[in-house]
Amino acid sequence: MTLRKTAGYLWNPISLIGFLLAVVATGLIIAFIAMEMITGIDHPYIGLLVYFAFPGMLILGLILVPIGAWRVRNQRRTEVPEEVPPYPRVDFNDPHKRRLFIFFVLASVIFVLIVSVASILGFEFTESTTFCGELCHVVMEPEHKAWQGSPHARVKCVECHVGPGAEWYVKAKLSGLRQVWAVLTHSYHFPIATPIENLRPARDTCEQCHWPEKFYSGRQRVFYHYAPNKENTPREINMLIKIGGTPKSPHAMGIHWHIGTEVTYIARDRKRLDIPYVAVKQKDGSIVEYMDTEKPLTREEIAKAEKRRMDCIDCHNRPTHIYRSPAREMDEHIVSGQIDAGLPYIKKVAVEILEQPYKSKEEAHAAIEAKLPEYYAKNFPEVAKVKAAAINQAVAHVKDIYSRNFFPRMKVTWSTYPNHIGHFYTPGCFRCHDGKHKTSTGKIISKDCNMCHEMIGQKGENIPEGKVVKEFVHPADIGDALYNVNCSDCHMAAAEDSAGGEGPGKH
């Protein structure tokens, strides 16, 4: 009996299923890649199918083909051992085997080409912001939304979170497997906890584009605010921010002194808001230690604690994923003309509506659409008629403010993640510069405002026009609290950036 004439080894259910999977997967890969190239569609779930699911399906199919053939051959060798040799014979003089060999070579070349192209494109896909930000849509929506409106919106996620080199690429992908599992099993945190553990040092990533020596002199900055009153009175703070020192000077000074000098610290909490210990390495190699006088650490605690060397991220901890307070967002929208400052109490009312708790984005949008026009119809009916278009435009922008800074599904709001730049809503600079960190000889880390910024001018309802302001004037008279209390103690508690709101509000 000639077994080949009756049926080949590949004619079995397992091998046929493998053939079917391989052919279908190949067709789908080619079709979807062609569609992406022709239409320009870059959808994360299409990428997941094309670069992972379909190649996996192809490989599985090609594994099933020889498994099925091997099972049939073993079975036939058991039945007719004299006609089936222990090992396959490759005889190129046999036309049938020659054709099979040519088919095998061509199929292998096609397989390698398809898998190679899919692997390269798959690698590029995993490096894309589409993969990082949109594939796990619910989990990453807050971060992706913040990135889209950030100063680094044209910088890919991997350039900061992974950086150059194969070592950190492998580490990132291995860490990513744990995160994928957390998403699949819904075991991730609400909200995502920060700072991220084992994040690549900022000197390896941030300093690919930025480095402390690049920023020399000061930078003028004007902060525009509006009082939460009927007139939305404009307030203006004009400052010189002392970023660095004199170009090519050996004297480190300004804000970036912290990076030019070796500074280490110990934080009590995960978010690094409570810093009881700071150590500065002097040029002669000696170490100067500053201890919190109110809550000092013992020597034993210092020895056991994790010491972190200060880098960019200790101040610029939200360089891209930035969430802004409703008050600050309203200031920016009013000064840009997107929201009409002529609408009475528009800042106060909008902030109050935005700060209400909502179960979903849809509920928040519905509340904004209802409450803002209702407020003007009830309290300022003439304004509601004359400025109906401005009110509708304000509604659209307030909804956008909510969408960019509040994410109920992930339990994220603008205040969830402290931003250490400045000291307005969080302690920021005052974590160390609080006047309470002292050395054993009595030297303190100064809280002098002029160390980091210098007042050029200020305008406000309580400042006479034309008056030259050299020191900051608070919009409300708070006495010595201006110097004895941190800004964030009041502003974060009230979720506002300015005092002076009086009269109607409460939509």
UniProtKB/Swiss-Prot annotation:
One of its GO terms (molecular function) is electron transfer activity. InterPro entries: Cytochrome_c-type_ET, Multihaem_cyt_sf, NapC/NirT_cyt_c_N, NapC/NirT_cytc_sf. Heme 3 binds at residues 152, 449, 452-453. Heme 2 binds at residues 157, 160-161, 496. The keyword Heme applies. Induction: Constitutively expressed. Disruption phenotype: Disruption of this gene eliminates the ability of G.sulfurreducens to reduce soluble Fe(III) citrate, Fe(III)-EDTA, and insoluble Mn(IV) oxides, electron acceptors with potentials greater than 0.1 V versus the standard hydrogen electrode (SHE), but the imcH mutant retains the ability to reduce Fe(III) oxides with potentials of <-0.1 V versus SHE. The imcH mutant fails to grow on electrodes poised at +0.24 V versus SHE, but switching electrodes to -0.1 V versus SHE triggers exponential growth. Growth with fumarate as the electron acceptor is unaffected in the deletion mutant. The chain crosses the membrane at residues 14-34, 45-65, 100-120. GO terms for cellular component: plasma membrane. GO terms for biological process: anaerobic respiration. It is a multi-pass membrane protein. Keywords: Cell inner membrane, Cell membrane, Electron transport, Heme, Iron, Membrane, Metal-binding, Transmembrane, Transmembrane helix, Transport. Redox protein involved in a high-potential metal respiratory pathway. Is required only for electron transfer to terminal extracellular electron acceptors with redox potentials higher than -0.1 V. ImcH likely transfers electrons from the quinone pool to a periplasmic acceptor. Belongs to the NapC/NirT/NrfH family. PANTHER family: CYTOCHROME C-TYPE PROTEIN, CYTOCHROME C-TYPE PROTEIN NAPC. This is Cytochrome c-type protein ImcH. It comes from Geobacter sulfurreducens (strain ATCC 51573 / DSM 12127 / PCA).
